[in-house]
Amino acid sequence: MTHPQPFIAVIPARLASTRLPNKPLADVGGKPMVVRVAERAREAGAQQVLVASDTQAVLDAARDHGFDALLTRADHPSGTDRLAEVAARFGWRDDTVVVNVQGDEPLIDPTLVRDVASHLAAHPDCAIATAAHPIHDAADVFNPNVVKVALDARSVAMYFSRAPIPWSRDAYQPHWPDVAAMPAPAFPVYRHIGLYAYRARFLRTYPSLAQAPIEQAEQLEQLRAMWHGERIAVLITERAPEAGVDTPADLARVQALFRPSSK
């Protein structure tokens, strides 16, 4: 009998969203969004679910619903930096698995959260684990808002990019630059899913790592870890995850799913 990998789920949440102000506190079926996310993390089997925020109202919302919460600094440039502060303050052991669950994903699949944590445990040479799913639409391959990942034989990341990787010379070159004429990929192309599991050891070192030129060019913070020699294990899942909440339209869509159906 196998036992699930023990892990801690941390939910970084900040109110300062330009497209959707006060997003973590938005009502989703009678509860704040950040609480809905925390409930999903708890369903995943996390040993501890912790909301990390620089805003007292977010912490109060989490605690009112029975979740742990920690006040963090307001000057963190990324959610990973916020996680690093949490890891340092709690003093977790180096091998503790910490999953970063985005605070704007109330529909995240608990099974995926659990599987990414287990995937990191299965790759002791990796500091990070994440997930990806196959792309079947050429438009997504060429969409810079869709982050792609190229993998080695062990499904460890070789590179993340907004560009179409890998580039199929024979399939794409005859049509370039007419993206609309591009055929669907006939070889594996994977879309990155922004869910991460970290070893606490890495989180404590992350703030001291200098930004990488490729990170600044692509605007992908996971490239900083790779630039400094860390490995990222990638779990392949066949199904695309539910979209997060970035805009008022996204929020309305999610609220409708939590609304009781009228008979």
Curated annotation (Swiss-Prot):
Major location category of this protein: cytoplasm
Keywords noted in UniProt: Cytoplasm, Lipopolysaccharide biosynthesis, Nucleotidyltransferase, Transferase
Known catalytic reactions: 3-deoxy-alpha-D-manno-oct-2-ulosonate + CTP = CMP-3-deoxy-beta-D-manno-octulosonate + diphosphate
GO biological process, one term: CMP-keto-3-deoxy-D-manno-octulosonic acid biosynthetic process
Top-level class of the enzyme under EC nomenclature: transferase
Pfam families cross-referenced by the UniProt entry: CTP_transf_3 (PF02348)
Superkingdom of this protein's organism: Bacteria
Keyword NAD: no
InterPro entries per UniProt: Cytidylyl_trans, KdsB, Nucleotide-diphossugar_trans
Enzyme Commission code: 2.7.7.38
Localisation per UniProt entry: Cytoplasm
GO CC annotation: cytosol
Gene3D superfamilies, A to Z: Spore Coat Polysaccharide Biosynthesis Protein SpsA, Chain A
Recorded GO MF terms: 3-deoxy-manno-octulosonate cytidylyltransferase activity
Biological or metabolic pathway of the protein: Nucleotide-sugar biosynthesis; CMP-3-deoxy-D-manno-octulosonate biosynthesis; CMP-3-deoxy-D-manno-octulosonate from 3-deoxy-D-manno-octulosonate and CTP: step 1/1; Bacterial outer membrane biogenesis; lipopolysaccharide biosynthesis
Family: Belongs to the KdsB family.
Function per UniProt: Activates KDO (a required 8-carbon sugar) for incorporation into bacterial lipopolysaccharide in Gram-negative bacteria.
NCBIfam families listed in its UniProt record: kdsB, PRK05450.1-5, PRK13368.1
Name used for this protein in its record: 3-deoxy-manno-octulosonate cytidylyltransferase
Annotated organism of origin: Burkholderia vietnamiensis (strain G4 / LMG 22486) (Burkholderia cepacia (strain R1808))
